[in-house]
C-alpha cells in the first residue's frame, strides 16, 4: 500500500538528510582528529557506514513501491554495508584505509556518473542537482587520484577525506532538506 505523498516534511524521513548529517559528523571528526586518531577514524567510518546501510535498508523495506529509486537505494545500501564491514573489521592501518577509500571513491564516482546519465536520458532531472553531482564527481576524481597515487601522507589523507566528507555531507543535507516527497527526486 502506497502512503499518500505530501509537500510537508513531517511525515517523511529524509534519508539523504540523515546520511548528510552522519557524513558531516565524520568529516568534522576527521578534521579535528586527522593527526592523532587514525584507528578511531577508520573504525568510526566503518560503524557509521553500517548505521547508514541499516537506515537505507529500513527506508527501502518501508517503501516497496519505489521503482528506479528503490533499485539505486538497494545498490547504495549494499555498498554502504560492504564499506561498513570492510572498515569496521578488515582495515587496521592508515595505508589500507587510504587504499580502500580511494577505490570506494572511484566506485561511487562511476555510480554517480551512471545515475546522472540515467536521469538525463529519462528527462527527470533538476539542473542544480546535476550541477552538484558534477561538482561532486570532479572533486571525487581529484581526491581519489590524490589518495591512490600516494601524493599525501597518512595524516593529510585523513584531512583530505575529512574535507571531502564534510562538503559531501553538506550537499546531502541540502538535498535532504529540499525533498518534497519520499519518491526520491521530486525537488522543490
Task: Tell where the protein language model's regions lie, with residue ranges.
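Structural signature of hydrophobic alpha-helical transmembrane segments
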Residues: 37-51, 95-107, 158-163
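Membrane-proximal helix-loop-helix units in multi-pass membrane proteins
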Residues: 83-133
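Hydrophobic secondary-structure block in the mid-to-C-terminal portion of proteins
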Residues: 143-188
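Membrane-embedded alpha-helical transmembrane segments of multi-pass integral membrane proteins
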Residues: 22-29, 48-55, 79-86, 104-115, ...
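N-terminal topogenic module of multi-pass integral membrane proteins
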Residues: 1-58, 177-188
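Cytoplasm-facing juxtamembrane segments at the starts of transmembrane helices
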Residues: 7-21, 64-77, 120-137, 155-157, ...
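Hydrophobic alpha-helical transmembrane segments in multi-pass integral membrane proteins
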Residues: 83-93, 137-154
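C-terminal ends of transmembrane helices
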Residues: 3-4, 54-67, 113-121, 172-179
Amino acid at each position: 500500500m502506497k502512503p499518500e505523498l505530501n509537500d510537508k516534511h513531517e511525515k517523511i524521513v529524509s534519508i539523504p538528510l540523515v546520511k548528510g548529517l552522519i557524513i558531516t559528523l565524520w568529516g568534522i571528526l576527521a578534521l579535528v582528529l586527522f593527526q592523532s586518531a587514525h584507528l578511531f577514524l577508520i573504525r568510526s567510518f566503518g560503524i557509521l557506514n553500517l548505521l547508514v546501510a541499516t537506515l537505507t535498508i529500513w527506508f527501502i523495506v518501508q517503501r516497496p513501491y519505489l521503482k528506479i529509486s528503490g533499485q539505486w537505494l538497494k545498490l547504495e545500501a549494499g555498498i554502504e554495508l560492504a564499506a561498513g564491514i570492510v572498515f569496521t573489521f578488515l582495515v587496521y592501518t592508515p595505508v589500507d584505509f587510504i587504499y580502500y577509500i580511494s577505490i570506494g571513491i572511484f566506485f561511487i564516482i562511476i555510480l554517480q556518473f551512471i545515475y546522472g546519465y540515467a536521469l538525463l536520458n529519462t528527462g527527470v532531472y533538476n539542473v542544480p542537482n546535476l550541477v552538484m553531482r558534477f561538482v561532486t564527481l570532479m572533486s571525487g576524481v581529484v581526491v581519489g587520484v590524490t589518495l591512490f597515487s600516494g601524493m599525501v601522507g597518512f595524516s593529510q589523507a585523513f584531512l583530505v577525506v575529512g574535507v571531502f566528507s564534510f562538503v559531501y555531507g553538506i550537499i546531502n543535507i541540502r538535498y535532504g532538506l529540499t525533498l518534497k516527497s519520499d519518491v526520491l527526486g521530486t525537488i522543490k
